């Protein structure tokens, strides 16, 4: 990739520079049209610009034109948009003077017009002057076949023009605010408009007779809360017709580019990477083959197999942050990020048809040129195959063919007349027969042939003989009503309820319809009706009657799936909160409980004995899973926890004074409302990283950060959220691995050498190796250390607290705890415990050393 910033490629007059608002490339890749604040449209020569990419000293070449080919100044205000027609014949320009001009290149040399530059090489004349808008015109777009043109502006109007006569076809005022962008579907079925009312409206148009338009869908979800400070909302449609890139979208508090899928019109993907609102997105007009990362050198018929059949599309996005990002549909991260590529906001972008050059305009009056090497984005598929990807949406090749001259249209009419002359005029006579004869309809011929084949008389040899034959016997199919099965009577089963009344027991309807048997009966009756002239209808056998009667009279239904012969093995586990008798007597408020339905296996004495021995637990309605997650984390067994204070901003440091890294955590909401999705959507957690006093990254998280720690050995930040998730990021903000969900609140994070130790609220320990990014220890319980004394009663008291944790050289976990004896005024004692990875249990450090020494002695002996 090369970046060109030429001093003469800008809108400049004398000593003053003007903002450039728009640019567009002609279909033949020979001209670049730009417009800006000076109210002039400038046409540049692209081949002359590209000579500077190959030769930096090309300014000394006299053959290179370092000025515009033409400069047009017919607008009375700033030029906000210019667009070449797809056939390259016209150039449309819109301005804040509310006038839409249609330009056409004039062949030959003519006298310069008033107001035009006398040194212009090309001369563009205004063919039509369209007046219909009541305010600034913001964007213009042509249909792929140049049949219609759509213009939008600040007057909320969407005006559709005829592409050949430039008459106004229709006007829509469906938006509630300024309309700042419009784009056409490459399959020529839709066009989309973007407005400051935070919506995108999809219009469907049909070219059946008079063109009709209708609003297909309204997209609002990606643009909730989007800022209204952007001057443009320039959309772009992918060349395969599958996606729309819409700038100035929002993902929480972050400005993004929304990728909208065709058909569903949903936005499952957002391009996140811009600090300020985006104003323009532009798809590369070429489709590229997807290159595998692990491409092999194997060949099949002399061709490499490293390239798959899947394709990629390239999209560029930019806006007020002066940053250009180039994305690929197959990668989650941008291919290219060029920061501060311009001095001010970027207003427009345009690709050449071959997809190798990108032009960028900015408010700093510069026009930036980016040139890409061959196969830098991948191997581009031929342009003819682009149409094949659009065929699934109904596009045809005829809609993409443009008549170049009047002679071409005359030749096409002559070709149509030639085809009509070659049509066989005797086709109707051949079908109906010669005059004077009556031909039998084709359907009767087929029936007569079939009847002849069944009777064995052979085929007819002449059409005249069929008229003398007997009229064919046609079977008439009559609709038969569903008859009840003979021998089966509807039996109602009466039951007696508790109060002595009789009720009809319900019959399961699963066997009321047997798909297999009903289908067989329908097929059998149809076959019998078709062959009623050959053989009489047979009655069902007595065995079938008895089977049907049994199936309909049964009260049991077949299961929807097969069950094993011995049943399904189940295991029920849980807490016994109350005895059955107490639950029936106390828990039920219904006085009409049927005691006969309660199966009590134990006797009264056994129940009294159980209730006296065990402590009955009562379920507290406030102790729910939601309340556990919402409450503040419990740190009763930690002497020092690492939970962040519930403040606006919290700082964490790692490293030395000479090499200091700082992490700033700004939780968007308080922990009391951490599960309020709407509040988190509006105020996400913001994490800032600093190194040597300079900001190195900025990240947004959809959760509240509970604790964090840094590891200087691996230069990694570890963040834990209130939802039990861990994030591992480096000092540049890149994720070292996908987020890890533990399912428990992490109340302490500490590092030891290149390991990170996580202690959860449920007294479990996890250890990760940050060098290999692997899990070293998992689900190590602390309860054997915290509750070493036998528990008496129904309550457990923890008298020990964890003071510190670290990893040894043998990758064993060592804990230092303080123990306070109950009802004692003595100083707390310090205890040391070691979790041996080889023994998978807790032990004292001395015992572990003895075990290691004995093992070494056995090995040496």
Curated annotation (Swiss-Prot):
Pfam families linked: Beta-prop_CAF1B_HIR1 (PF24105), Hira (PF07569), HIRA_B (PF09453)
WD repeats (start-end): 14-54, 74-113, 132-171, 174-213, 227-270, 295-337, 341-382
Keyword Electron transport assigned: no
Residue ranges of the region described as Disordered: 450-471
Entries under InterPro entries matching the protein: CAF1B_HIR1_beta-prop (IPR055410), HIR1-like (IPR031120), HIRA-like_C (IPR011494), HIRA_B_motif (IPR019015), WD40/YVTN_repeat-like_dom_sf (IPR015943), WD40_repeat_CS (IPR019775), WD40_repeat_dom_sf (IPR036322), WD40_rpt (IPR001680)
Residue ranges with Low complexity bias: 455-466
Gene Ontology biological process terms in this record: chromatin remodeling; DNA-templated transcription; regulation of DNA-templated transcription
Sorted UniProt keywords: Chromatin regulator, Nucleus, Repeat, Repressor, Transcription, Transcription regulation, WD repeat
Signal peptide residues on this chain, from the entry's feature table: none
Xref: SMART domains: WD40
Top-level division of the source organism's lineage: Eukaryota
Gene3D superfamilies attached to this UniProt entry: YVTN repeat-like/Quinoprotein amine dehydrogenase
Role this protein plays: Required for replication-independent chromatin assembly and for the periodic repression of histone gene transcription during the cell cycle.
Name assigned to this protein: Protein HIR1
Organism of derivation: Kluyveromyces lactis (strain ATCC 8585 / CBS 2359 / DSM 70799 / NBRC 1267 / NRRL Y-1140 / WM37) (Yeast)
């Amino acid at each position: 990739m090369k970046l060109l910033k030429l001093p003469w490629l800008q809108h400049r007059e004398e000593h003053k520079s003007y903002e450039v608002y728009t640019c567009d490339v002609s279909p033949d890749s020979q001209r670049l049209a730009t417009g800006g604040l000076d109210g002039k449209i400038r046409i540049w020569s692209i081949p002359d610009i590209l000579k500077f990419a190959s030769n930096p000293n090309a300014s000394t070449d006299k053959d290179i034109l370092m000025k515009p080919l033409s400069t047009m100044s017919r607008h009375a205000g700033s030029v906000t948009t210019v667009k070449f027609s797809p056939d390259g014949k016209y150039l449309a320009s819109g301005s804040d003077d509310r006038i839409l001009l249609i330009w056409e290149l004039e062949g030959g040399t003519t006298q310069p017009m008033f107001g035009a530059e006398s040194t212009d090489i090309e001369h563009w004349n205004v063919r039509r002057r369209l007046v219909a808008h009541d305010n600034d015109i913001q964007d213009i777009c042509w249909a792929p076949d140049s049949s219609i043109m759509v213009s939008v502006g600040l007057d909320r109007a969407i005006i559709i023009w005829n592409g050949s006569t430039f008459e106004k076809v229709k006007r829509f005022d469906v938006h509630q605010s300024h309309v700042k962008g419009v784009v056409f579907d490459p399959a020529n079925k839709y066009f989309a408009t973007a407005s400051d009312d935070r919506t995108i409206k999809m219009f469907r148009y049909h070219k059946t007779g008079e063109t009709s338009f209708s609003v297909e869908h309204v997209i609002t979800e990606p643009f909730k809360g989007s800022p209204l400070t952007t001057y443009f909302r320039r959309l772009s449609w992918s060349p395969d017709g599958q996606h729309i890139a819409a700038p100035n979208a929002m993902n929480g508090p972050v400005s993004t580019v929304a990728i909208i899928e065709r058909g569903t019109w949903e936005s499952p993907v957002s391009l996140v990477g811009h600090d300020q609102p985006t104003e323009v997105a532009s798809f590369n007009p070429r489709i590229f083959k997807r290159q595998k990362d692990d491409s092999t050198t194997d060949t099949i018929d002399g061709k490499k197999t490293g390239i798959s059949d899947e394709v990629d599309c390239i999209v560029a996005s930019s806006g007020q942050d002066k940053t250009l990002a180039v994305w690929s549909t197959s990668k989650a991260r941008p291919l290219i990020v060029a920061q501060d590529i311009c001095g001010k906001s970027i207003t427009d972008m345009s690709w050449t048809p071959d997809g190798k050059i990108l032009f960028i305009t900015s408010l700093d009056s510069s026009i930036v040129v980016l040139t890409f090497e061959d196969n830098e984005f991948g191997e581009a598929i031929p342009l003819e195959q682009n149409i094949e990807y659009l065929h699934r949406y109904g596009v045809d090749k005829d809609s993409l063919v443009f008549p170049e001259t009047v002679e071409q249209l005359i030749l096409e009419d002559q070709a149509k007349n030639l085809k009509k002359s070659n049509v066989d005029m005797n086709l109707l006579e051949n079908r109906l027969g010669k005059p004077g004869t009556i031909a039998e309809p084709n359907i009767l011929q087929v029936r007569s042939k079939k009847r002849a084949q069944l009777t064995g008389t052979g085929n007819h040899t002449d059409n005249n003989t069929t008229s003398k034959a007997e009229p064919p016997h046609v079977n008439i199919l009559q609709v038969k009503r569903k008859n009840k099965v003979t021998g089966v009577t509807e039996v109602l089963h009466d039951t007696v309820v508790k109060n002595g009344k009789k009720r009809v027991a319900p019959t399961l309807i699963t066997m009321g319809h047997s798909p297999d048997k009903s289908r067989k009966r329908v097929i059998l009756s149809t076959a019998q009706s078709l062959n009623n002239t050959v053989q009489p209808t047979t009655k069902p056998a007595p065995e079938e009657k008895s089977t049907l009667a049994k199936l309909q009279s049964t009260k049991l239904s077949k299961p929807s799936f097969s069950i094993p012969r011995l049943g399904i093995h189940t295991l029920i586990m849980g807490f016994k909160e109350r005895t059955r008798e107490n639950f029936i007597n106390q828990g039920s408020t219904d006085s009409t409980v049927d005691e006969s339905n309660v199966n009590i296996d134990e006797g009264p004495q056994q129940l009294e004995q159980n209730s006296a021995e065990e402590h009955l637990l009562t379920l507290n309605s406030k102790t729910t899973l939601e309340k556990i997650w919402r409450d503040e984390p419990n740190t009763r067994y930690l002497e020092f926890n690492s939970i962040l204070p519930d403040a606006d901003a919290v700082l964490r440091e790692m490293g030395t004074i000479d090499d200091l890294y700082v992490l700033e955590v700004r939780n968007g909401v308080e922990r009391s409302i951490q599960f309020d999705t709407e509040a988190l959507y509006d105020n996400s957690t913001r994490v800032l990283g600093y190194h040597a006093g300079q900001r190195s990254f900025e990240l947004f998280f959809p959760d509240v950060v509970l604790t964090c720690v840094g590891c200087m050995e691996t230069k990694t930040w570890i963040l834990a959220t209130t939802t039990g998730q861990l994030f591992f990021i480096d000092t540049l903000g890149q994720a070292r691995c996908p987020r890890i969900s533990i399912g428990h609140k992490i109340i302490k994070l500490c590092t030891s050498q290149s390991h990170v130790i996580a202690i959860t609220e449920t007294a479990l320990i996890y250890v990760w190796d940050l060098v290999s990014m692997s899990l070293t220890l998992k689900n190590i319980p602390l309860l054997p250390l915290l509750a070493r004394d036998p528990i008496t009663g129904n309550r457990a008291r923890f008298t020990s607290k964890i003071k510190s944790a670290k990893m040894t050289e043998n990758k064993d976990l060592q804990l230092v705890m303080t123990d306070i004896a109950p009802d004692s005024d003595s100083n707390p004692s310090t205890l040391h415990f070691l979790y041996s990875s080889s023994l998978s249990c807790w032990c004292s450090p001395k015992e572990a050393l003895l075990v290691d020494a004995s093992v070494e002695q056995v090995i040496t002996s």
